[in-house]
Amino acid sequence: MARTGIINNFYFDAEVFTDYMQEQSTINDILLASGVLQYDPIIANTLGSSGNVAAVPMFASIDNEEDALNDDGKTNNVPTELKGKKMLIMAMARMKAWKEKTYTRYLTGKSPLHNLANNLVVPYWKAQRQLDLIATIQGVLGAEGMETHVTDLSTTSGSITEANKIALTSTIDLGQKAVGDRRGNFSLFICHSAVAANLRKQELLQNVTYYSDVLGKDVTLPMVNGMICLETDTGTVDATNANFPVYSSYMVGRGAIGTADKLVHAPYGVEFDHESNGGEEKLYTKQAYVYAPYGMSIKATEIVEESPTRDELKNPANWELASDHKFVMIACIKSNG
């Protein structure tokens, strides 16, 4: 039987609310449209409803195989053994609860909690997932062996010039330096609003309308050098030196990050506390999910608890390469604009 409750005299069914949350994707539409997040059934099946750490297989590329043999009727066609690798993944579990004093409703006739349940929970979780994704990207880029995936144009002294800002060729040059001839696979550009404004002024950032197979509709999205632009001021600037802000702009490739949700017990529920403050209604939410950058392993033994914090995701010491760095489709430009 569904666990139920009351919010502002509104009958709450946790199962129905869960279905509603699943229908209202908690992943940003821009992230979905870019295709950087790839649902991975292997990850989903490996973690399933139990466990939070798993080793999942990576199938090695054959790009560097020797040339095909000459079929001359004499040469033996000796098979090359296919090899695979594994990368370690770890689910991140998050929870958040809200409460409302019923006295507030008594005075105003309005229910903030009801409004939150109907309108704000989905945007909240979209923002949280986006922050975890950016933290993961930051950690990966600082890992040993990923040095060529970062270009630093910034300065923290003297004066800021155009050379310290992103220009027409900046993303092209970084893409080539990071992954060589695979640079055309970059599909998402995450940047601060100051960087986006700079690109707009140069007419390098423009709105493009097209049909998105992922979203199933026509969309108009900002794009720069063929990449969809996600503009966010969170996690994209180091303002330690106010006169020389350093902006981090991230490039992510299509299908670069495997993802899957992990089953959690009672993801949504309500409770009425008769005792506290003359009565309080509470809404509880939980989510668990995996962001697994292909080609990288998280060092699960370095994670203190059973779920990595955002700071632990950001820490490069908690990540290591599981393949050639060129198969990690993540890169970063540091600039002053």
Language-model segments: residues:
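N-terminal "assembly arms/tails" that initiate or stabilize quaternary assembly
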Residues: 1-89, 258, 317-337
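Alpha-helical scaffold segments that mediate packing/assembly in large oligomeric complexes
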Residues: 104-178, 312-314, 319-328, 332-337
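Extended serine/threonine-enriched, polar tracts that run as long, contiguous segments within proteins
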Residues: 192-196, 202-204, 211-282
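Short helix/loop capping segments that flank catalytic or ligand/cofactor-binding pockets
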Residues: 64-67, 108, 198-201, 207-208, ...
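Protruding loop/beta-arch "assembly-hinge" segments enriched in small, turn-prone residues
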Residues: 1-26, 245, 251, 259-266, ...
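Short alpha-helical segments and helix-capping/turn motifs at coil-helix boundaries
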Residues: 35-43, 173-175, 266-269
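Extended, solvent-exposed, turn-rich assembly/linker loops in the middle of proteins
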Residues: 143-221
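Long, contiguous amphipathic alpha-helices that act as assembly "spine/axial" helices in icosahedral shell
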Residues: 56, 83-149, 181-190, 194-195, ...
